[in-house]
Amino acid sequence: MKRMMVAGFAGAAAMMIGGALGAVSNQSYSSLAQPRPVMDINGGTMNPMIGGQAMLPGRNLLENIVASPEHTTLVAALRDSGLTDALKGGGQFTVFAPTNMALSTLPARAMGEDKAQLARMMGYLVVPGKYDSRALLKAIGEGGGQAKLRTVEGGVLVARMNGPTNVLLMDEKGATADIAIYDVYNKNGVMHVIDHMLEPAMAARQVASR
């Protein structure tokens, strides 16, 4: 039964493409704590490095997460939860990627034994659509100081400013995380590195399949 639940969740997550809140704007905004990507001489985006490793914009989200030495625990959790296909396929997604240290605070049960709960936790870190720093700032401004981001798990992450230059995320339990590295661009979305784990509410939800 648990395998069926996980498989069903993963399949639904893979189908959640598009429909993100807000849109990328051409308007200029103040830079955030991390420097924005620069352009190389050929006009291609250059991503920030993670743990000394290059994050190539021509890769998909899963490939860059796998390449990051700071996200080995996240890679294992994504594989166990069955969400890897969603992050290497088509569509556009935003991933809020907790570091190994952030995930080390979770109990062993959450990371290994309860696969259905693990799938929910991983799906809560993924938002349909491309929310780079500019799009996040736009959504926060349009939301009167906060943006509610619907995740593929079905829950909501709240984004708001933490001081003049940083975005803070709050989960459904009231826990918060800062974005430590912004705007790691991939061919199927964008990744932001976060310094704490964010979790959905305990109550199970039905994941939308469209």
Report the location of each language-model feature.
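Mature, structured domains of secreted/extracytosolic soluble proteins
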Residues: 22-210
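Gram-negative bacterial Sec-dependent N-terminal signal peptides
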Residues: 1-25
